[in-house]
Structures are given as structure tokens and as C-alpha cells.
Amino acid sequence: EVPELPKEPKAKLGDIYQLGEHRLMCGDSTKESDIIKLMNGQKAEMVFTDPPYGMFLETDYSKIKGSEKSIGFKGNKKGNKYNKILGDNEDFTDLLISNIFKNFKYCKEIFIWGSDYFVDLLPNYGKDGSWFVWNKRSSEAQQKGIGNCFELLWSKKKHKRIVYNFEWFGFLSKDDPKEARNRLHPSMKPTILLTKIIQSYSEKNNLIADIYLGSGSTLIACEKTNRKCFGMELDPIYVDVIIKRWE
């Protein structure tokens, strides 16, 4: 279950939490020193992450802004209000991506959402890896809705190309309607989708690193699949959310 956003966060920058087998840090992924503290001498078998690629970065769609207006096919659902993403008014920095490859170059499996927006920062422009498609819509009516109809996921290793069909119309989802209704983060992914991908490309008890943890869906997916997640999130508010979701 996804909790409400706290008005005043308990977490502070630099805090590290042990959540069962998982490790969570309120830190800055553009700082190599924070990544070293998070990993604490351990090595991940997989990196699975979703960088904040909306930061002053040209994209082919307009951002969905939270509102109190009624939305949906029959106007029967209130719009989600998202907390302002830290750093969203700053220029996109290459460190958001280069730090992944610098600190996890030993990882055979690296999965990065939204890589099509910074393909020039991927090894050999992403040609050596594979691309996966998450198709969010299933009907023509949904295709005309606000926001992207699909998202791309790049993997460092060559895999069979797959299209994952999981409806996620911002607030509607046949697969997990409760999670979709309670969506708190603008780039939040359905846990059921992350669970399927993580199960397919990692083993039980593997350590999965996510240095852009957001609302914590990767950690929850790891909990459900008997993996360990070492995650980092810059915003103390979302660190509190992650802890509440795990509890």
C-alpha cells in the first residue's frame, strides 16, 4: 500500500536505514561518495533504476501536472498532486547517468528507464544492449489520453526484445487499481511490472541497486521476490514514503 506524503519528513540527507535485508540512503546519486556509503563494500548483481530524466531535458511530450480537476473517461477521478521533484529546476547533468556506469561497471545486468532521452550517454549509444517496451495503454480511447503511451527500458546486456503490456493510465490500472489510485510520484512504475522484470533477469537473494529509488517500487518488488535492494533517494519526503511502504 502506498502511504500519503508526509508534510514534514523525518529523514535527513545522509541518513541510512536498514530495512530487513534492504538498505536505504537519503543521498545524492551524483556524488560518488554517497554511492560508496550506500553499497558499504558490497557489490550488486543488477542495477535497476529510473533517473530523473525530466530535468530541463527536451522530450516529445508535455509533463502531466497534478491538479484537483476531475479526470478519467467519465470525469470520476480527481487528479493526483505530486510533490515537487528535487532538482527539477536544474540543468540535466551527465553525472546522473555516468555515475551508474562508473560505480557499477562490474554489473552484467544494468537496466535504465527512459534511456531513449539520453542515448548519447549510453555505451556505444545503446547499440550493444537491448530495448524493452512498456505499453501502458490497451484501447484507442486510452491512446488519446494525456501522457506517454509507452516507456522504454534499456539493458546493458543483450536480451530478447519484449513488450510488457501493463495498463497504467496515471490513475487507472486493471493489474493493480489500488496502487494506481494512490500513485504519489510522477515517474512511479507499477510494482507488478517491476516484479516481473526483476524475476526474469536476476536470481533469488541477488542484490539489486537502485540509486534513483523514487517512491520505492524497486525495493517493494525486491521484497516480494526475495531479492535485496540497496536504494538511494534524494528527497527526504520520499525516503519516509519508502520506509512506510516497506513497513
Residue ranges and their predicted role:
Residues 92-103:
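Short, conserved SAM-binding segment of the class I
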